[in-house]
Amino acid sequence: MGGRDLIQQFEWDAEKEKANIKKHGIDFETAKYVFNDEYRVEFLDSAHSTLKEFRYITIGFVDQMLTVIYTDRNDAIRIISARIATMKEARLYYDDNNKIYS
């Protein structure tokens, strides 16, 4: 993992983070560094987006492969949840990055 020099602003709900740690074992302070992964894969989470709020899924590497759900709010990235990536998500990451080297 490269340096931890984030330029984005991040925010999250502290109670939601506590619930996320209990459920997934990942704190949002760590999860925000997935945005430093220049090879991360991002796409719209259309199943959970609304007309008022678009949600996104990003898959990237911190110390392990993580999946982070977030939205853009008030010029900040608002983290909604974070967990260890599933095998399917890890495959998306590696398949997408194999295109770079092909």
Q: Which residue ranges define each predicted feature?
A:
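Ribonuclease/tRNase effector modules and their secretory precursors
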Residues: M1-S102
